Design a protein with these regions (language model features):
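C-terminal soluble interaction/assembly domains
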Residues: 181-267
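Long, terminal "pre-/pro-" and other extracytoplasmic accessory regions
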Residues: 6, 15-29, 33, 37, ...
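Extracytoplasmic/secreted proteins, especially bacterial periplasmic and envelope-associated proteins
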Residues: 4, 37, 41-52, 83, ...
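Post-HExxH zinc-binding segment in Zn-dependent metallohydrolases
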Residues: 13-63
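Pan-zinc metallopeptidase signature
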Residues: 75-188
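Alpha/beta-hydrolase
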Residues: 50, 54, 61-74, 81-84, ...
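Short alpha-helix carrying the canonical HExxH Zn2+-binding catalytic motif
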Residues: 1-9
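Second-shell loop/turn segments in exported
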Residues: 1, 28-39, 75-82, 185-192
Length: 267
């Protein structure tokens, strides 16, 4: 009940509206990363209060490691859901000393999962991606964010490697292309610096090695029909092409500025 009462306070006072903001870079919608951030704050605040309440009024029921264990043992999909409670509560606990201070974390919320993971105010880097689609259509674009990246890498890598590889995330744009019944993506990842880019690329090679087989310049998924190709667009930007093999083999990336890129797909 303490947990749900916090949600009542959040909505009655309009705190949730301060956290929910759109991303013009993803066509005026809320990005996947910003949506995760929203739930990390809302559920993290409620879980923080719940933990405080249990510790004070029902100490025999307290199990501070329960969420951590659940998160560690979960599937990737489950981790994305449990993170809002586990990692969100950790973030709120670092931001406030008391439940009485919760309004502050809502009125001045984080703008990315990166800020939640590191309790930082690092801004999202500038990244612009244009497309020349040929006979393909640019169907959707989104910002996935550091938390999504970390959890995705964790499916094939150990925790420390996945965390280190995702650290240094500056911005990303995942663009989905479609042609008839075929789909593919270009995932442009911009890093804080060249060292972070290099670390990610090395880890991603190991990630691919665990789930796919190298075939020339591409990787072919062992238990599916997905194809992957990794391109170093600049020393601070990595592009991962994935999905339909024809798309992955033919797509190119052109650098028009250090943070501006054009994805071109052959007809």
């Amino acid at each position: 009940l303490a947990h749900e009462f916090v949600h009542t306070v959040q909505f009655v006072n309009g705190w949730h509206e301060s956290v929910w903001t759109v991303d013009p870079e993803v066509r005026g919608s809320i990005s996947h990363d910003r949506e995760l951030t929203y739930y990390l704050v809302l559920e993290g605040a409620a879980t923080f209060v719940e933990n405080r309440y249990v510790a004070q009024y029902a100490p025999g029921m307290a199990d501070g490691d329960a969420l951590r264990r659940a998160y560690q043992n979960a599937s990737a999909y489950e981790r994305l859901n449990i993170a809002r409670y586990h990692l969100g509560a950790e973030y709120v606990a670092e931001r406030v000393d008391s439940p009485a201070d919760l309004e502050r974390v809502h009125r001045h919320p984080p703008t990315s999962t990166e800020q939640v993971l590191h309790n930082s105010t690092d801004p999202i880097e500038t990244l612009t991606v244009t497309t020349e689609t040929g006979n393909w259509s640019d169907r959707d674009r989104d910002r996935q964010g550091e938390l999504f990246l970390r959890i995705a890498l964790r499916t094939e890598l150990n925790r420390s490697t996945a965390v280190d590889a995702a650290h240094g995330w500056g911005d990303d744009r995942r663009i989905t292309f479609a042609k008839e019944n075929r789909t593919a993506s270009a995932w442009v990842l911009h890093w804080d610096d060249a060292d972070n880019a290099t670390e990610f690329e090395a880890a991603f090679d190991r990630y691919l090695d665990a789930k796919a087989s190298a075939n020339g310049s591409v990787w072919e998924q062992d238990d599916g029909n997905a194809t992957y190709r990794v391109v170093e667009a600049t020393n601070e930007t990595t592009v991962v092409f994935l999905g339909n093999e024809t798309f992955v083999r033919s797509a190119t990336v052109n650098t028009t500025h250090e943070t501006q890129f054009d994805i071109e797909v052959e007809s």
